[in-house]
UniProtKB/Swiss-Prot annotation:
One family name in Pfam for this protein: ABC_tran
Catalyses which reaction(s): phosphate(out) + ATP + H2O = ADP + 2 phosphate(in) + H(+)
InterPro entries reported in the protein's UniProt record: AAA+_ATPase (IPR003593), ABC_transporter-like_ATP-bd (IPR003439), ABC_transporter-like_CS (IPR017871), P-loop_NTPase (IPR027417), PstB-like (IPR005670)
GO molecular function: ATP binding; ATP hydrolysis activity; ATPase-coupled phosphate ion transmembrane transporter activity
First-tier enzyme category under EC: translocase
Xref: SMART domains: AAA
Cellular compartment(s): Cell inner membrane
GO annotation, biological process: phosphate ion transmembrane transport
Name of the gene: pstB
Highest taxon in the source lineage: Bacteria
Its biological purpose: Part of the ABC transporter complex PstSACB involved in phosphate import. Responsible for energy coupling to the transport system.
EC number of the protein: 7.3.2.1
Protein family (similarity comment): Belongs to the ABC transporter superfamily. Phosphate importer (TC 3.A.1.7) family.
Protein name: Phosphate import ATP-binding protein PstB
Length: 266
């Protein structure tokens, strides 16, 4: 039974960008993720869905080592990042280096108390880019990729807080894109936005899939169906089902997945 119309017009890729092997994650003594195996495909959008507290955001934050900020958290298993086959969860891998390769956009817009230009240039400066001409080129390119350039090109010196909520979120996306990440993580990026701004962000995500691999956490199943190529359904820290979005939404293999998607459970 077809409940939602999945995204169309984009070719599914089976080129692996990342492989998750037997991933377990613990908040102190509490196990939040249980033995997860999953593929992440290159230049595709993968949506993570499931009820509140199922582990979606916890899983997402493993990819850029956000959990390292709290000392009692710990991982087991691997997240392999191609093409160099590096296990990014290894203690020998610097989490700062991981975050240079894997950027994140959060639930609520979080611009820095700086100008529009300096918000986007911030990560570039940290990475050692100093020449003004290069900064200007990279900032413009990031703002164009975030579909924001035409709206802000004449006021790059204005404070980012003067932008609307939707513009601030696109600015955060531009900031994440400026350092050319290999993977872009979205944690419910439209939950704090109105329907018009939400539609703009969804269109942007669809456009970005041609440039970068994307993982998105969303509680909105219609959104997952609209923007994603692959979908993972999670429940109580376990990955219940993973596959092409059209398969998950039209003909899921697992009864629990079907019950969640059709609203009988969740």
């Amino acid at each position: 039974m077809q409940i939602f119309k999945p995204a169309s017009g984009h070719t599914h890729s089976t080129v692996q960008k990342s492989v998750v092997n037997k991933l377990n994650f613990y908040y102190g003594g509490y196990q939040a993720l249980k033995n997860i195996d999953m593929m992440v495909y290159e230049k595709q959008v993968t949506a993570l869905i499931g009820p509140s507290g199922c582990g979606k955001s916890t899983f997402l934050r493993c990819f850029n080592r956000m959990h390292d900020l709290y000392p009692r958290n710990h991982y087991e298993g691997e997240i392999i990042l191609h093409p160099d086959n590096a296990n990014i969860l290894s203690p020998e891998v610097d989490p700062i280096e991981v975050r240079m390769r894997i950027s994140m956009v959060f639930q609520k817009p979080n611009p820095f108390p700086k100008s529009i230009f300096e918000n986007v240039a911030y990560g570039l400066r940290i990475r050692g880019v100093k020449r003004r001409s290069i900064l200007e080129e990279r900032v413009e390119n990031a703002l164009r990729n975030a579909a924001l350039w035409e709206e802000v090109k004449d006021r790059l010196g204005d404070l980012a807080f003067n932008l609307s909520g939707g513009q601030q979120q696109r600015l955060c996306i531009a900031r994440a894109l400026a350092t050319d990440p290999e993977i872009l993580l979205f944690d419910e990026p439209t939950s704090a936005l109105d329907p018009i701004a939400t539609a703009s962000i969804e269109e942007l995500i669809s456009d970005l899939r041609n440039k970068v691999t994307i993982l998105i956490v969303t509680h909105n199943m219609q959104q997952a169906a609209r923007v994603s190529d692959y979908t993972a359904y999670m429940y109580m820290g376990e990955l219940i089902e993973f596959g092409a979005t059209d398969t998950i939404f039209i003909k899921p293999k697992n009864k629990q997945t079907e019950d969640y998607i059709t609203g009988r459970f969740g």
